């Protein structure tokens, strides 16, 4: 048996993405994956030209992904089954990665209650792109983890429907602007 890892998107809408990650270990080594969650792969991710990354521009030209995609950790449920003092580290990817969460045992974090969402603290740092990595320490044969993480997508990096229905978002040419710029002159 070899170490086995899974990645499953449970929900991906205009505001949130929920992802399930698992890892089962055979004792042959640790997980060291700097891009376990790729931020530009989610529904509505915008390209440098303002179109969705997944589509092509008029004329069939491929879109270029942004260099960074903003996510905030909204909720987290985890279970790390380990016979030693092993742990799982989730981090925000950058040249100098920043720890998002250290996981050991089981627990949850919920930014929906009195807690706040946890933003990516690598924004503006060298090599920051919004991706999330997973690294383990001390995992041996028959150890495992399950993580279910919900992230909030930041508006400036993901489409919320403003291109399909600009009037609903008060975007031009349907936007209402104070001072008469929209022809109402009041």
Model-flagged regions — what are they?
Residues 117-146, 150-156:
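Noncatalytic modules at the cell exterior or secretory-pathway interfaces
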Residues 98-120:
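An anionic, turn-rich surface loop/hairpin at beta-sheet edges
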Residues 24-34, 84-86, 98-99, 136-149:
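Short, surface-exposed beta-strand/loop "edge" segments at domain boundaries and coil↔beta transitions
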Residues 36-38:
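Active-site-proximal loop/hinge segments that shape catalytic or ion-binding/gating pockets
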Residues 82-105:
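Short, surface-exposed beta-strand/strand-loop-strand elements in extracellular ectodomains
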Residues 140-186:
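Mixed-charge, glycine-accented linear interaction segment located at domain edges/termini
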Residues 1-27, 182-186:
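Short, intrinsically disordered N-terminal pre-domain segments
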Residues 41-87:
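Beta-rich globular "head" domains
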